[in-house]
Every structure is written in structure tokens, then in C-alpha cells.
């Protein structure tokens, strides 16, 4: 018999200590990784529910197992809320991750060796948009587009590449692009060459849900997202469309199950349902507006302090700092800031002279700091601290500056906890 008094602390103290250490790390470090966020206690409660135990192969009303009546309620709730949130007429909440959602879209609409045209990973795209090390670059003939010296998508270059390679699908979306994508222009190019337009909006889904960033739904044939970045929900994936194409929807349904996945994670779908309900609340829009304000405030400080920001600014939740002119690598900057309890990630910049695991830039994102209550003033102050650390790298006072910055970080983290 399983007793509710069972706990990890008594049974597995080594694992329990790692959990406690991670809890402390999140509370005492400032999180600036653009793809991370803090899930609400409600979301985590759903993920820890007894839906963890339930197998539910199939879809609501069409399951292969019995006892799915409550799983059906949960999944339909998530579907209906996502439809309302994103103004979609098709939603699949079963993908376990964004990459698996993308794989399902490719599987539904492409054959092996078909040509896809996606944004280069080195220029801000994602592994699954055709990178050679990804399944998307191995199974399909992947052609890549990039950004200009100013850090902007060159739509005429995208068009010319599309006319040359005649892709079956154009992939729009990004993991490190700080400007607004012209979804309508991308659809225009796709239509010109007879291609599907597939948009991966994982990074900006929360902004889109709040109306802070343009939605690709009116333009794309199909859209995917994760649920844990700007959306702030559980780790998972989502497929959506507003194409009013039942044949397309049938292909997508069967590509998720049974082609790419077996049983869905019902406890995670329950958490997605909670996340979508939270995103429909009025205060969610205020949060997403603040995410962008905070990013802009940080950009202003970096520029004032003499650091080059790719594309010269941001219109979303993230930005890239190019460290080439300062003679710093992204790897070293990541480590130095990490020593001051500021977590970023190293990131390639356009025409990066360094290797992918070294890089010449850092990516900075504001969803997490905004979640814990940072406004423009705190964000600008934080950017100043980061510049202090970067300025001191390689100098005699580096250790002293890092120690002083860490004290400031610990103080503001105590004042603005993640979970109060």
C-alpha cells in the first residue's frame, strides 16, 4: 500500500538535497535565460497530481484504454482554452516538447528529402529548423536563411532562396531574434513558391497570447510552440492552426498519435490547462507588457555602457549582446556572470569568429525576472551590474567586482523572491 506520508527526504536524501539546492539556486540567482520561466504553484500542483498514473492513448472520446473519462475532461479543457487564447480552430495539446511538436508537423506535411527553408541556427534559428545536427537537417533537405549585418531578417533574401530551392515548407520563428517577424511577408513568399508556412512561435507565445507581439495564426498553415518559455507553463509542446483545413488537421492529429508518440502525459496536459487559464486573466497582459519594457530598459543600459546589441534593440523578451569588440567570449562572460549569481547563456552572434561552444555573445531574456517582480528600474540596475562584471573581466579587480555584484544580487533576490 502506498502511504501519503511517503516522502523523498526520508527515502532518498541525496536526491532530496539536490532538489533543495536547486530551489535555493533559483531563489538566490537572477535568471536571464530567455527560454526559461517560473511555473506557478498551480501549474506544479497539476503536474504532481494522480493523472501521472493514467495512460490515455488516443484523443478525447476515442481512447484505447478505459477509465479515461476524467482525462478527457482535462484534455478538452486544455484544447478549448488554447483555442480561445490564440484564436485557433485546431489545437493539439499532446506533444511532449516543442521539438516533438515540430517533428509531428514535418511528418504530417513532408516526405523524407523534401526541401525546407528555415532560419540558420547561427543567425538565431533553432536546431529543429534545419540544423545539420538535428533530425530536421538529416531527414530533410534543409536550406537556411539568415540575418543582415544590422541583425534583421532580409525578406528579399528569403524570397530569392525560396525561388531557387522551391521548398515544400518555409519555417519561420527563432530562438534568438529580438525583432518582429513579418508573418504576412513570410506567407506571401510561401504562396509564391507553393510552400507551406510553418511558424515556430515558442519564444514569443506568451507575448502573442497577450497581444503584445503579432500573431502568426492568421498567416501560417500551422504553428507550434512550447508551453514553458514566455507562456510560463509546464515543459511541453503545442500545435495550433487557424487555417480551417480539416484535411490538414487530420494529418496533424495522426502525426502526433500514433506516428510520433504513444500515450500523452495527462498530468502535463492538466498543467497546460492551468497555464492557459492563467494566460486568459487580465493581469497576464500586464505581465507580458512588462517583460518587453524590462528588456528595452536593459538594452538601453548596455548601449549606454558601450556594448553592441544585435539589431540595435529589442521588440520582444530577449536580446543578444555582441562581445567581439570587447575581446570577450560568450563562454567566459557566462561564467563570470554566473559567479555573481546572474544566469545567462552564451550565444552565437552574426559572423561569430568563435566556435559554437565558445561563441562571442550572450543572450539575455526577461520573462523570469519580470515574474519575480522586476520593473524597468530594477532591470536597468541589473544591466548596470552586468556591465560592471563584463568591464572587469581580465582585470585586477575582477574578483572584487564579482563579489560585490553577488551581494547586490542576493539582496534583490531576497527582496523579490520567486515564490513568496
Curated annotation (Swiss-Prot):
Site location (Plays an important role in substrate specificity): 228
Localization per Swiss-Prot or TrEMBL: Cytoplasm
Pathways involved: One-carbon metabolism; tetrahydrofolate interconversion; Amino-acid biosynthesis; glycine biosynthesis; glycine from L-serine: step 1/1
Annotated keywords: Amino-acid biosynthesis, Cytoplasm, One-carbon metabolism, Pyridoxal phosphate, Transferase
UniProt-annotated binding residues for (6S)-5,6,7,8-tetrahydrofolate: 121, 125-127
Principal location listed in the UniProt entry: cytoplasm
GO biological process, one term: tetrahydrofolate interconversion
EC number(s) on file: 2.1.2.1
Cofactor: pyridoxal 5'-phosphate
Catalyzed reaction equations: (6R)-5,10-methylene-5,6,7,8-tetrahydrofolate + glycine + H2O = (6S)-5,6,7,8-tetrahydrofolate + L-serine
Annotated positions of the N6-(pyridoxal phosphate)lysine modification: 229
Pfam families listed in its UniProt record: SHMT
Molecular function terms, GO-annotated: glycine hydroxymethyltransferase activity; pyridoxal phosphate binding
UniProt function note: Catalyzes the reversible interconversion of serine and glycine with tetrahydrofolate (THF) serving as the one-carbon carrier. This reaction serves as the major source of one-carbon groups required for the biosynthesis of purines, thymidylate, methionine, and other important biomolecules. Also exhibits THF-independent aldolase activity toward beta-hydroxyamino acids, producing glycine and aldehydes, via a retro-aldol mechanism.
Record-given protein name: Serine hydroxymethyltransferase
Organism annotation: Pasteurella multocida (strain Pm70)
Gene of this entry: glyA
Amino acid at each position: 500500500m502506498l502511504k501519503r506520508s511517503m516522502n523523498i527526504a526520508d527515502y532518498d536524501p541525496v536526491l532530496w538535497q539536490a532538489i533543495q539546492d536547486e530551489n535555493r539556486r533559483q531563489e538566490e540567482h537572477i535568471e536571464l535565460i530567455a527560454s526559461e520561466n517560473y511555473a506557478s504553484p498551480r501549474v506544479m500542483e497539476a503536474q504532481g497530481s494522480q493523472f501521472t498514473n493514467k495512460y490515455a492513448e488516443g484523443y478525447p472520446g476515442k481512447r484505447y484504454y478505459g477509465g479515461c473519462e476524467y482525462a478527457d475532461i482535462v484534455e478538452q479543457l486544455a484544447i478549448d482554452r488554447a483555442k480561445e487564447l490564440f484564436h485557433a480552430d485546431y489545437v493539439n495539446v499532446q506533444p511532449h516538447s516543442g521539438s516533438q511538436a515540430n517533428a509531428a508537423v514535418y511528418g504530417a506535411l513532408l516526405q523524407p528529402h523534401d526541401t525546407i527553408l528555415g532560419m540558420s541556427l547561427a543567425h538565431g534559428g533553432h536546431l529543429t529548423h534545419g540544423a545539420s545536427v538535428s533530425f530536421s537537417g538529416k531527414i530533410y533537405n534543409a536550406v537556411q536563411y539568415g540575418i543582415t549585418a544590422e541583425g534583421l531578417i532580409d525578406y528579399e533574401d528569403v524570397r530569392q532562396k525560396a525561388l531557387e530551392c522551391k521548398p515544400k515548407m518555409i519555417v519561420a520563428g527563432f530562438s534568438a531574434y529580438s525583432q518582429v517577424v513579418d508573418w504576412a511577408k513570410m506567407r506571401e513568399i510561401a504562396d509564391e513558391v507553393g510552400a507551406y508556412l510553418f511558424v515556430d512561435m515558442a519564444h514569443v507565445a506568451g507575448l502573442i497570447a497577450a497581444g503584445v507581439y503579432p500573431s502568426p495564426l492568421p498567416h501560417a498553415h500551422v504553428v507550434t510552440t512550447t508551453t514553458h518559455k514566455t507562456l510560463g507553463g509546464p515543459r511541453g509542446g503545442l500545435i495550433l492552426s487557424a487555417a480551417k483545413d480539416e484535411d490538414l488537421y487530420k494529418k496533424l492529429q495522426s502525426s502526433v498519435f500514433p506516428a510520433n508518440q504513444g500515450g500523452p502525459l495527462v498530468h502535463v496536459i492538466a498543467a497546460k490547462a492551468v497555464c492557459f487559464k492563467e494566460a486568459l486573466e487580465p493581469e497576464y497582459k500586464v505581465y507580458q507588457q512588462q517583460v518587453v519594457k524590462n528588456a528595452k530598459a536593459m538594452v538601453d543600459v548596455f548601449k549606454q555602457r558601450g556594448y553592441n546589441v544585435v539589431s540595435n534593440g529589442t521588440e520582444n523578451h530577449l536580446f543578444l549582446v555582441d562581445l567581439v569588440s570587447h575581446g570577450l567570449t560568450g563562454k567566459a562572460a557566462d561564467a563570470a556572470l554566473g559567479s555573481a549569481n546572474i544566469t545567462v547563456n552564451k550565444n552565437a552572434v552574426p559572423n561569430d569568429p568563435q566556435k559554437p561552444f565558445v561563441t562571442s555573445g550572450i543572450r539575455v531574456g526577461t520573462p523570469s525576472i519580470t515574474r519575480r517582480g522586476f520593473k524597468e528600474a530594477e532591470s536597468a540596475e541589473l544591466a548596470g551590474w552586468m556591465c560592471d562584471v563584463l568591464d572587469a573581466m581580465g582585470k585586477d579587480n575582477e574578483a572584487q567586482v564579482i563579489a560585490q555584484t553577488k551581494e547586490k544580487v542576493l539582496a534583490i533576490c531576497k527582496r523579490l523572491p520567486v515564490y513568496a
